[in-house]
């Protein structure tokens, strides 16, 4: 089972490396999810803009709500005008239409759909503001000391920050607490 989780964490590290320009590579951390051993790192605690890695916290909170029964995978949630107005990438559903939590999670994590981050936030907590408050409370509870969220999709806001270390911890927590949802990360 430990080898099963190594691939997503290694992929997260590779994506971070590939997304950064060669001359100005961003902070990074690569660790073994089974043991927690850090294999290599560069400025892992340095604050930086998380972009779409924000969606990992969005997914984590949704996974917690699925576990407690607050949400169900087959539950339909409405697309609000606010969710529909999010910048691309998005799937572009019309306000008032409905989507299952399962499909919203798939499009959030596979296509990085910004509109689905808002749909899930509103479906889970009623408002994006309340969801973001929960994101920050959860980050604090997990010890993500360099992390502060302003929105659930990662669209740019200079106040939205994290670190490679914090994202690594969050990824490991997701894999440890919710192995049943690992398929969302391998599509």
Regions of interest found by a model, annotated:
Residues 1-10:
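Bacterial N-terminal signal peptides that target proteins for export
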Residues 9-19:
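Bacterial N-terminal signal peptides
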